[in-house]
Amino acid sequence: MATLSLDQLSIIPNRTPPHKPAPQASDAQRMQMVQLACAPYPQWQVSDSELRRSGPSYTIDTLREFATPHNQLVLILGADAAALLPVWYHAKHLGEYCMVAVMQRIGSPFDDQQIRQQLPNLVITQIPWAGIDISSSAIRQRCAQGEPINDLVPANVADYIHQHHLYGAPRD
């Protein structure tokens, strides 16, 4: 948060995007896991705004909902998601509502040149990420194989996944 000078961080679990298969956890379960993960951080707010919305989940709609004249929104994305920005729904309007911060994994350079050419009004900043190399796919794969995930998610989230047998987590 300090790197981007943020006063607050809003974590917004998304509905199933139109381009992805249905999730293995319900909206309520995903919301609960995010709330558990964010509980220790008072400046992190969890919003169910996308989960309450009917129809497809588009980032531009969420940005419009959160935009006010007195705040600067920052959309934080991983490099994999940021690379697809030009094909997002109403991508050319993203810069009207936010700037984009791309979390760049150490050793994985992210070239934003093409994005800047296609979306010239979008301000993009890159933030080096030295944290744990995590992917939702790796978490689901480990769960399905009965392997521990405590090194990838907070302990309370790992417990929740195990208790609710999500992502193929074995039953006791």
What are these language model-derived features?
Residues M1-D172:
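Nucleotidyltransferase catalytic core that binds NTPs
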